Amino acid sequence: MGVYDAIRKCVAFVGYPNERGFSAIGTGFFAYIQQGGLDFGYFITAAHLIRNKRPVSVRINKKDGLSETQETDTDKWIFHCTKNMDICAYPTTLNPRGDTEPHDVLYLTIESAALDGHELHESGLTIGDEVFISGLFASREGEKRNIPIIRTANIAAMPEEPLWPSPAVSYLIETRSLGGTSGSPVFFDLSRAGVTKKAEPPIIGLINQTGGSYPIMIMPYYFIGMILSSHAQRYEDDFFPDGPQADAEFNAGISVAMMAHDVLSFMNDDPNMRRYRDNIVEKKTRAIGHRPSTAVESSPDVRNGSSS
């Protein structure tokens, strides 16, 4: 199946600078949600990529054809309140002035793009259906900029029981390829199932272009989850080993994917995420004397982890 190229703009690579430029260990994606009418942007990825003693960096593509590597502040990462939920978020600056925004990114409008709950049931998504994954291929991350690839895959098992040690049920996806997908978003082309989720296409994201940011509708792609690992592995020790792992070393061809429901629940309802947003709104309100019309100016920038 053909895939609209803009979907690759929602991802960036997680890793470390090295003598060649950058060594990627996994993927993450940009998404934003609203709370109280305010926009909050995040970089979402798998927590096991971040839970180590060394601060990780994120390499983001730019409109000039190059990229920018930004070291993250370890203390700014927001982890799920349940330790074994393998997801975390880094607050970013969502710049509505696309003509001055150097980064070539697509922020997923996660709430309208997600296939969840009743709509997931109505979609008919089932074992054997084809899905696609946007993310890193570990053998070709790109020298000057990220080169995300699109992997086509198939649902090997629908979410039924938790896969130890995660407390949440997950998809098993036959990816037929090696590592690098941890933290990658997974999409389903609903048109191939012969059904339509809504009368109107979803606003799947906000894309920065010269002249400003604008909503982009990519019908009928829907977000169904996030890759946790590109292997099915029972860890005998701590679920989060001390340091990154090359999951290609014990790749089994089966990826474990967190459901969109759990990604949405983390972003909307997790106490750690809500506490962060509540603090931002409170500080902004005190500073200007009334409820702000946007939270963008207060959101930490992935470039330096600072807040205004």
Feature locations, PLM:
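Serine endopeptidase catalytic core focused on the charge-relay Asp
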Residues: 8-11, 16-18, 25, 51-175, ...
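Short, surface-exposed secondary-structure edge patches
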Residues: 3, 33, 120-123
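Cytochrome P450 catalytic-core helices
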Residues: 45
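Bergerat-fold GHKL/Histidine-kinase-like ATPase
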Residues: 176, 305-308
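A conserved glycine-rich beta-strand in the N-terminal activation segment of trypsin-fold
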Residues: 11, 17-41
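Histidine-centered active-site/metal-ligand motif
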Residues: 48
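Residue-level recognition of beta-strand microenvironments
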Residues: 31-33, 158, 189, 229
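C-terminal subregion of chymotrypsin/trypsin-like serine protease catalytic domains
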Residues: 4-6, 188-304
